[in-house]
């Protein structure tokens, strides 16, 4: 039965790999989120000679709003393609489907082209935030708070970094406001605010009845060896 186990494992890996439109479907979004947030597809396809790509994820409390910005370099001098995706809250799968059936789509997607000057300004801001530096080993990124997670393959080299609310640099990233201004989804960003962990835990417990599932949909990523890991999503 080894062949069957191998087939099942391959199918599971394929289901968890980021796919076009995956964020718009609640089931695929949940299955693929770890790989999408961590830029696994960018890393897997990273090679010299391929167009440079960037992905910036803004987690502004997982069950309130999540924004994903995918940038792909066009031929020299032509700028880049920007795909902006906003998930208005990331409720449980059944809730998301019911919202969509009721005419309340949970996801907005917009595609635009960045002229070379705008792309250059954005990349300077990303570099200015310290993207190229090694990420903090063991950094915890909790879903019920605010953070930015960025991954990129530039000139055949892949890299990842992250910034959390509360970190000094988080207040002056620069690239965040540029992305919000370039975003054509029409959805206002969920701005950072103070989060009380104790109150958050209490609210989650009340929503789930205080039972085993009292953490509700909360999870965390941990930065390790230049990648993100999470027992809740598998690695």
Which ranges hold each PLM region?
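Function-determining sites in protein domains
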Residues: 17-235
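Sec-dependent bacterial lipoprotein signal peptides
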Residues: 1-16
């Amino acid at each position: 039965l080894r062949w069957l186990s191998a087939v099942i494992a391959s199918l599971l890996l394929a289901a968890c790999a980021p796919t076009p439109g995956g964020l718009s479907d609640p089931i695929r979004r949940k299955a693929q989120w770890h790989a999408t947030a961590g830029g696994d597809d960018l890393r897997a396809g990273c090679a010299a000679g391929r167009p440079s790509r960037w992905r910036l994820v803004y987690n502004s409390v997982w069950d309130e709003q999540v924004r994903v910005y995918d940038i792909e370099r066009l031929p020299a001098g032509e700028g880049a393609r920007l795909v902006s995706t906003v998930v208005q809250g990331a409720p449980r799968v059944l809730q998301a489907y019911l919202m969509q059936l009721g005419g309340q789509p949970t996801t907005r997607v917009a595609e635009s082209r960045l002229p070379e000057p705008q792309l250059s300004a954005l990349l300077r801001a990303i570099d200015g935030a310290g993207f190229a530096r090694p990420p903090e080993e063991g950094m915890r990124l909790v879903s019920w708070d605010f953070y930015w997670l960025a991954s990129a393959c530039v000139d055949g080299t892949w890299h990842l970094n992250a910034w959390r609310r509360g970190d000094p640099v988080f207040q002056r990233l620069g690239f965040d406001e540029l992305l919000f201004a370039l975003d054509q989804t029409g959805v206002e960003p969920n701005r950072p605010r103070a989060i009380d962990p104790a109150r958050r835990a209490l609210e989650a417990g009340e929503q789930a009845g205080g039972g085993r599932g009292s953490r509700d949909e909360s999870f965390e990523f941990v930065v390790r060896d230049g990648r993100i890991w999470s027992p809740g999503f598998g690695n």
